[in-house]
Design a protein with these regions (language model features):
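Nucleotide/phosphate-binding catalytic cleft detector across ATP-hydrolyzing
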Residues: 1-154, 162-251
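Acidic, divalent-metal-coordinating active-site segment for phosphoryl/phosphodiester hydrolysis
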Residues: 159
Length: 251
């Protein structure tokens, strides 16, 4: 299949690849695993996430983006190369036009870094569109109308609020408090209250399954398994949605 254009939602936590007419074809964690001895990429996405926090000293698993922008250029380029190659398949010899998302407050230098990394990763042409615009289009909002529309986009590294009118962003604000901070808050809450250590994947699972910003009358529950900090042995607890609300209340 000849793919002319692809869209990449390049997030701090997860990356999504979109093909017109087919929708989302790739949804994987924004993580790259490296062999530190020879600087070789070992895994990207789901496979690399499995290595996070479990790798030996000679293997490093990194998130190459921070707060929605490139923190490690070389690693980001390798990751983009993987996602583009996976999307196109081995039989597609043509370079696609790639549209990449970026934060509302991205600087010209940060924009250029994303475009250059995308071109070096295998794109024929690369363009960056700010995330609030893409979120509005995805939600079916008429961005070219004269009336204002407020978009709240909560990602892994940043949460952005933007007002859109006449096809552009009139005003915006960005907070470096988003999904990853919620995961950290949940893990810290479990550690303090239950003396139980849990990893970021477990904390994320709790957030997704029973996450709530406010107390609920009908509480949701889930089992949380971790390591007892006194004995070092595995132990399970039952956590509810109101506890999650309490854990993230400071954010």
């Amino acid at each position: 299949m000849f793919i002319k254009r692809i869209g990449i939602d390049l997030g701090t936590t997860n990356t999504l690849v979109f093909i017109p007419g087919k929708g989302a074809v790739v949804f994987e964690p924004t993580i790259v695993a490296y062999d530190l001895n020879d600087n070789k990429v070992l895994a990207v996405g789901h496979e690399a996430k499995e290595m996070l926090g479990r790798t030996p000293n000679d293997i490093g698993a990194y998130r190459p983006l921070k707060d929605g922008v490139i923190a490690d250029y070389k690693t980001t380029k390798a990751m983009l190369q993987y996602f583009i190659s996976k999307t196109l398949g081995s039989f597609n010899i043509f370079k696609p036009i790639v549209i990449v998302s970026g934060p509302a407050g991205i600087t010209s230098t940060e924009r250029r870094a994303v475009i250059n990394a995308t071109l070096e990763a295998g794109a024929r042409e690369a363009y960056l569109v700010r995330e609030p615009i893409l979120a509005a289009l995805g939600a079916g909002i008429p961005i070219n109308s004269a009336s204002g529309h407020m978009i709240v986009n909560i990602g892994g590294g940043t949460a952005e609020v933007a007002v859109i009118s006449l096809g552009g962003i009139v005003s915006w604000a960005s907070l470096r408090i988003a999904g990853n901070k919620f995961d950290e808050a949940i893990a810290e809450y479990v550690k303090k209250k239950y003396n139980l250590a849990i990893g970021e994947q477990t904390a994320e699972k709790v957030k997704i399954e029973i996450g709530s910003a406010v107390n609920q009358k009908n509480k949701l529950e889930c089992e949380v398994r971790g390591r007892d900090l006194d004995t070092g042995l595995p132990r399970s607890i039952t956590m509810n949605s109101n506890e999650v609300a309490e854990a993230i209340s400071g954010h």
